[in-house]
Amino acid sequence: MSVYSLPPAPPSDEHQLFQRAQALSGFTLGELATRAQWVIPADLKRVKGWVGMLLEFYLGASAGSKPEQDFADIGIELKTIPISAQGKPLETTFVCVAPLTGNSGVTWENSHVRHKLARVLWVPVEGERHIPLAERRVGAPLLWSPNVEEEELLRRDWEELMDLIVLGKVESITARHGQVLQLRPKAANSRALTEAIGEFGQPIMTLPRGFYLKKTLTAPMLARHFLL
């Protein structure tokens, strides 16, 4: 792999994207960062999205942090997932920011969550903390769309969580709500507040929330992929 100073053009189709992802498999993050002339952080505490951004660079992603999919032209979202030596996910997976106001007419079919998860390129990365960031290896990629059962579980959780938001109960939602999808605060600091609906229909200020996939969905998915 030669030195990259500019990212490649966006992939023309799913096959090309998957080939690019396969070509990264087995490399360490340090090797990829050096070839891209990126500085490797000591850890991910202040740069949580660094691994994803590095892989986006190599794969030719275009969306950045916009609400559309990372590869909008071919309808694919990229998700990196830190895994253990046993191939199990080590944390939940961020999907998108949750809308806390203006939700009339929103259904599962036209929701951001469903749009983002329609087709996902999963790239597992070694994530155990004793492995220095630069030495963590990229794993074999997986192209995934929710099967009928997964889609039904996601829809049910999304509808339950959105009902609570619309009914003004956002403050009472905990990470335990939802079988495969959870809602929890997403903010770099506790002063970053956003508007939501209170219990009596009044506007309130609260922490922004994000939708996250629980390990109850990603662990079986990876197990099928790696034949664990």
From Swiss-Prot:
The keyword rRNA-binding does not apply. One of its GO terms (cellular component) is cytoplasm. It is found in: Cytoplasm. InterPro entries: DNA_mismatch_repair_MutH, DNA_rep_MutH/RE_typeII_Sau3AI, DNA_rep_MutH/T2_RE_sf, Restrct_endonuc-II-like. Pfam families: MutH. The keyword Nuclease applies. Keywords: Cytoplasm, DNA damage, DNA repair, Endonuclease, Hydrolase, Nuclease. It comes from the Bacteria. One of its GO terms (molecular function) is endonuclease activity. GO terms for biological process: DNA modification; mismatch repair. Its main location: cytoplasm. Belongs to the MutH family. Sequence-specific endonuclease that cleaves unmethylated GATC sequences. It is involved in DNA mismatch repair. HAMAP family: MutH. This is DNA mismatch repair protein MutH. It comes from Yersinia pseudotuberculosis serotype IB (strain PB1/+).
